[in-house]
Each structure stands twice: as structure tokens, then as C-alpha cells.
């Protein structure tokens, strides 16, 4: 039977570091479960593993689409299933690491995404509307999905509306459970509120030092400021700075505030998942890593 280990939790909690530690211990690649890391060139702002980290540990399911491509949870599940099958044939477990709840749930036996193909004409009509107007429309048509999607996430807002308007039913009502043909261990990496805020602030400044602002300038010049991905968390705030609507200090503060809000929504999502085993991060990184290895070894031996 297939065996899948999931490492999940809010942004900046330390999932990636733990995932790499487990990958090295198990001798398997990290299968990323991040809805923005799938896109090429969106690197620093998505906290994509660096080249050095990718040399140390193989990462799959990153850089699989261009920023102008349509990519959704159904396509992600297709790619993830192929990687899981490949690892199973090699007698190895799959290690999924990320904070995109929909991606993780679709792969781990939760949601079966509705098979609604893209509608270019409908997308063109939606693209000319203001993002806040689209979000308000989604709140009316599908309040459950709207509650799970950030108001700045244009890609997911447009997709949810596309499904609603194409089928006449809310996206949230069309998801169904898929049958499990594997065993699953889900490990949650959380953090206390103050510690998480501190990590978010530190990570934001590290990203700026690593060249995030230059990345945004490059992407805006190459694809134009209206590229939907440039309206997502962090890229939108730095775009406002480049347009001289905020100074840099205000842009960074807004990134921290919005990231905290996003992390809170992620925690709400993952806390509602019944099968997640939460690790005690307050015991320190070394203890956390040892706890995770012990749980994984028991799971694989079972």
C-alpha cells in the first residue's frame, strides 16, 4: 500500500526545515504542497527552496508552470499522484510538505476537485472587473469558498467564480471525498502567536535582503503589473511601494500584518483536520525533529 507522510502548518512555522530533515532521513524528495511555488520565477516571495537547499534535497512539484498558465488543484493532484506512484514503485514513502490546505486535502484522500475546464471567454470578462468587486460577488455566490480565500488571491477568486458561473453551483458544494488507497501520517507544525509573529517579521526582512523587491520589479517589467499572481500576498504590497502608494516601511508592515492574518486562517483550516498530529515546537528544533522521526518510523513500521 502507498504510504504518505504530510508535514503541514501555517506559513513561517518551520515546515520546510522539518520537511528537509525528514527527506534526508528517509532518502526521499520533498513533494511541495504550495499553490504559488508551482510557478517559475516566483521564488523569493513564495519562500521557494534556494538552489543550495535544492542541491541538498530534491524538491518536486515546484516550477511546473509559467506565471501566465492556468494551474489549479486538479492539475496539482494529477502531478502529485504521479510522483506518489513513482515513489511507491521504488518502495519509498511520499513526503508532502506545505501549507496549501486544498492541495494537501485533494491528494491525501480529502477533496475531489470538480472537473470544470477553463472558460477563456468567461475569464476575459472577469479579468476586467475590480478584484474587490469579484470577491464581493464570490461572497454572495459561495460564502464558504470566499471565507477560505484571501481577498487578494485573484487566481483562486476567479477560479471559484468560474466554477460557480459555469455549473450554477457553488464550488464548495461540488467537492466530494475521494477514496483512499494509501495510509497517511499528517504532522502539524504550529507555533505560539508571539513566536510566529516574530518569525514572520524576521522572514519578511530576510526576503527583502535576499532580493525580493528586485524580483517584484523584474516580474512586473516582464509580465506587467496586472498579472494575477502579482496581486497575491507580499507581491501586492511591494507593488504598491513601487507605485509610490506606500513607503517601504509601510509596505513591509502590511506584509507582516497580512501574513499573520493568512497564518491564522491556515491554522483554523489545519486545526479542523481530524488526523493531524501536532508536534510540540516549544521543546526546541532538535526535539521537534526527533519527535517527527520517531512518529514517522512507527508509521512506516505499522
UniProtKB/Swiss-Prot annotation:
EC assignment: 2.5.1.75
Catalysed reaction equations from the record: adenosine(37) in tRNA + dimethylallyl diphosphate = N(6)-dimethylallyladenosine(37) in tRNA + diphosphate
Molecular function as annotated in GO: ATP binding; tRNA dimethylallyltransferase activity
Family recorded in the similarity comment: Belongs to the IPP transferase family.
Subunit text: Monomer.
NCBIfam families found in the cross-reference section: miaA
Keyword field: ATP-binding, Magnesium, Nucleotide-binding, Transferase, tRNA processing
GO BP term (any one): tRNA modification
InterPro entries, sorted: Dimethylallyltransferase, IPT, P-loop_NTPase
Keyword Signal: no
Gene symbol of the encoding locus: miaA
Annotated Gene3D superfamilies: 1.10.20.140, P-loop containing nucleotide triphosphate hydrolases (3.40.50.300)
Domain of life: Bacteria
Region (Interaction with substrate tRNA): 34-37
Known cofactor(s): Mg(2+)
This protein's name: tRNA dimethylallyltransferase
Site-annotated residues for Interaction with substrate tRNA: 100
Function of the protein: Catalyzes the transfer of a dimethylallyl group onto the adenine at position 37 in tRNAs that read codons beginning with uridine, leading to the formation of N6-(dimethylallyl)adenosine (i(6)A).
Binding site for substrate: 11-16
Annotated source species: Gloeobacter violaceus (strain ATCC 29082 / PCC 7421)
Amino acid at each position: 500500500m502507498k504510504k504518505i507522510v504530510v508535514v503541514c502548518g501555517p506559513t513561517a512555522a518551520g515546515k520546510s526545515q522539518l520537511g528537509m530533515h525528514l527527506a534526508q532521513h528517509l532518502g526521499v524528495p520533498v513533494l511541495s504542497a504550495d499553490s504559488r511555488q508551482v510557478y517559475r520565477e516566483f521564488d523569493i516571495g513564495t519562500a521557494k527552496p534556494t538552489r543550495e537547499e535544492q542541491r541538498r534535497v530534491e524538491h518536486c512539484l515546484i516550477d511546473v508552470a509559467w506565471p501566465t498558465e492556468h494551474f489549479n488543484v486538479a492539475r496539482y493532484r494529477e502531478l502529485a499522484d504521479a510522483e506518489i506512484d513513482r515513489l511507491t514503485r521504488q518502495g519509498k514513502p511520499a513526503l508532502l510538505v506545505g501549507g496549501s490546505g486544498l492541495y494537501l486535502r485533494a491528494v491525501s484522500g480529502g477533496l475531489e476537485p470538480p472537473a470544470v475546464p477553463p472558460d477563456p471567454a468567461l475569464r476575459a470578462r472577469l479579468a476586467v472587473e475590480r478584484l474587490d468587486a469579484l470577491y464581493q460577488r464570490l461572497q454572495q455566490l459561495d460564502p464558504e469558498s470566499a471565507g477560505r480565500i484571501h481577498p487578494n488571491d485573484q487566481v483562486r477568486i476567479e477560479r471559484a467564480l468560474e466554477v460557480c458561473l459555469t455549473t450554477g453551483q457553488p464550488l464548495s458544494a461540488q467537492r466530494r471525498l475521494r477514496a483512499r488507497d494509501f495510509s497517511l501520517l499528517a504532522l502539524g507544525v504550529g507555533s505560539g502567536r508571539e513566536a510566529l509573529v516574530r518569525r514572520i517579521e524576521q522572514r519578511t526582512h530576510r526576503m527583502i535582503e535576499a532580493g525580493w523587491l528586485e524580483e517584484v520589479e523584474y516580474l512586473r517589467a516582464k509580465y506587467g503589473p496586472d498579472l494575477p499572481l502579482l496581486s497575491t500576498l507580499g507581491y501586492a504590497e511591494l507593488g504598491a511601494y513601487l507605485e509610490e502608494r506606500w513607503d517601504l516601511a509601510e509596505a513591509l508592515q502590511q506584509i507582516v500584518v497580512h501574513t499573520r492574518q493568512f497564518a491564522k486562517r491556515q491554522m483554523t483550516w489545519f486545526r479542523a483536520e481530524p488526523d493531524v498530529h501536532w508536534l510540540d515546537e516549544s521543546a526546541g528544533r532538535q526535539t521537534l525533529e526527533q519527535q517527527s522521526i520517531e512518529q514517522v518510523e512507527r508509521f512506516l513500521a505499522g
